[in-house]
Amino acid sequence: MARYRHSRSRSRSRYRRRRRRRSRYRSRRRRYRGRRRRRSRRGRRRRGYSCRRYSRRRRRRY
């Protein structure tokens, strides 16, 4: 009985953690995407650095 209870609590905690992590990552990604689009447009006009290279570096990190 003790063994069953332990495994059950373990699986439940893992599921909860995974769910929370996933939602947080999704929200952060969406916010980052919107901010990046606005910033890249403004930066391209002001500075003359290549946007393609910058985006590639960011993508690799994610």
Swiss-Prot record:
PROSITE patterns registered for this protein in UniProt: PROTAMINE_P1
Biological processes, Gene Ontology terms: chromosome condensation; sperm DNA condensation
InterPro entries per the UniProt record, alphabetical: Protamine_P1 (IPR000221)
GO molecular function, one term: DNA binding
Any one GO cellular component localisation term in the record: nucleus
Superkingdom of this protein's organism: Eukaryota
Annotated localization: Nucleus; Chromosome
Tissue expression summary: Testis.
Region Disordered, residue ranges: 1-62
Keyword set, alphabetical order: Chromosome, Developmental protein, Differentiation, DNA condensation, DNA-binding, Nucleosome core, Nucleus, Spermatogenesis
Family stated for the protein in its record: Belongs to the protamine P1 family.
Function: Protamines substitute for histones in the chromatin of sperm during the haploid phase of spermatogenesis. They compact sperm DNA into a highly condensed, stable and inactive complex.
Protein name per UniProt: Sperm protamine P1
Taxonomic lineage from the root: Eukaryota, Metazoa, Chordata, Craniata, Vertebrata
Gene: PRM1
